Amino acid sequence: MSLGKFVSFEGTEGVGKTTAINGLCERLQAQGIEYVRTREPGGSPFAEQLRELLLDTRTQINDDTELLLMFAARSDHLAQVIMPALSAGKWVICDRFIDSTVAYQGYGRGFGNADMLHKIEALIAGFVPRLPDITLWLDLPVAEGMQRAGKRSVADRFEQQQLDFFDRVYQGFEAQQQAQPQRIQRIDAQGEVEQVADRIWQSVSQQL
């Protein structure tokens, strides 16, 4: 049995990942493709507990602790959900993965500091056995995304950050896309829902 495909979605706050993933899953189902839909941080029972801690506005931890908790959640998620699904020939559709860690912890928290980025690279090398086959970076102006995200009822610990934090996060996604253009594909997230869905499908269908 051939391995399934691993697709991740990335972007700053309010870019429309949930809607985009809904659309892709509908198209995969129409093609008769089995898939597992998951998310980070989270995705497995233990990782979901860590997600609650990481997103709780009452949580006060330093940047290194936050980074290590992200990878603790990811390690369990990979072992319990992602790798078994791929081995069974299923596609995995993941809302955020390693590129969010680089963008949020490496650039948002770490200001693109080489020391923090090296720590992340070492953790990826040591604990991530499989990168996504394709990563869809939903590209939307930060201010527009924040305006969308602001309509949500309750902001989590990351959503409460200031605009300059998300400007750095955006720079992190942009830098990764430029460094890995084959894996990380930029998707214009502006326009109607179906327009964005078509752009995504154009990229993903190449994996069929």
Swiss-Prot record:
GO terms for biological process: dTDP biosynthetic process; dTTP biosynthetic process; dUDP biosynthetic process. ATP binds at G11, T12, E13, G14, V15, G16, K17, T18. GO terms for cellular component: cytosol. CDD domains: TMPK. The keyword Kinase applies. Keywords: ATP-binding, Kinase, Nucleotide biosynthesis, Nucleotide-binding, Transferase. Its EC number is 2.7.4.9. One of its GO terms (molecular function) is ATP binding. InterPro entries: P-loop_NTPase (IPR027417), Thymidylate_kin-like_dom (IPR039430), Thymidylate_kin_CS (IPR018095), Thymidylate_kinase (IPR018094). It catalyses: dTMP + ATP = dTDP + ADP. Belongs to the thymidylate kinase family. Phosphorylation of dTMP to form dTDP in both de novo and salvage pathways of dTTP synthesis. HAMAP family: Thymidylate_kinase. This is Thymidylate kinase. It comes from Psychrobacter sp. (strain PRwf-1). The gene is tmk.
